[in-house]
Structure formats: structure tokens, C-alpha cells
Amino acid sequence: MMDWKRSFADTKVRDVYDLIVKEPSKVQRSAKIMDVIDQMLMNPTSRKVYVIDVEGNLIGVVNTEMILRLIGYRVGVKENSSMAFVHFLKDTLKEDVEDIMILKVRPVKRETPLTEALKSMIEFHVNDLPVVDDDHKLIGELMSSELFIAAKRLFESP
């Protein structure tokens, strides 16, 4: 009988990271928010658009939560508080990706153990991780769904 717990522990990011998302959504640093929305619409399984420089190096990320918040501000869906109004003033006029991208990105590499990627997802409350090569160029995206595929046998009845 196969030891699935051991099998999962031996799995690397390279074994699963492209099962669902074949090509990560990405834009250049100079892109507009509209470009991010277009990328999200073209790749609806992904919840992020990665920001890269001209060499393809990962420099940031824009997630769906940020875009939804900006949409909410533009259509008037907001909380009734002074902090919400401050956020509204701060965010509503933004048009450039550089203004909204998150700089703290925690990438993994193809050789990263899947257990390490899982630990990062849990610790940093993220569902997806960018996959980069040794030169920090974006080559893929590891989605939580891909971890589910690899771990599903852990929950099967004996």
C-alpha cells in the first residue's frame, strides 16, 4: 500500500504547478489597471496578475481583492466610516498598476518541496504562489487547487 503522506512530502512544485494554470497572467510595470482587468478576464482560473519588468523578472502582484475594492469605490459600494472614506480618496483615482501592486511577493521555485509551498500559503494567507526560475523570472503559478489534486488521497478512507 502506498504511503500517500510520504508521497505528498516527496512532491515538488515542478510536479503540479502547471496542472491548471498553464501560463500565469502578467503585465509590465507600466501597465494600466484596465490591462490587469483584461488579463483577469482572459485567465479566470487565476486570482492574480503578476507584474514583471522588461526582462520578465517578478516585481509585484495585483490580486482580485484589490481590483474588487477599486470597482467598489468607483460604483459607490463602501463602508460608512471615516477610514473607508480615506481609502476611497487614496484609491479611487489610481489608474496605474504601479500604484496598486503588492510588492511583498513570496515566490517558489520548481524544486521547492510542495510541503514548503503549502506552509507559505497557510502562513501568509494566500491561495496561489508565483513560480520563478533561478533568475527570478516568472515561469508559472502554483494554485491551491493544484495542491488539492496532489493531496486528495490523504483524505481517502483506508
Segments the model singles out, each with a brief description of its role:
Residues 1-158:
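Tandem CBS (Cystathionine beta-synthase) repeat/Bateman regulatory domains
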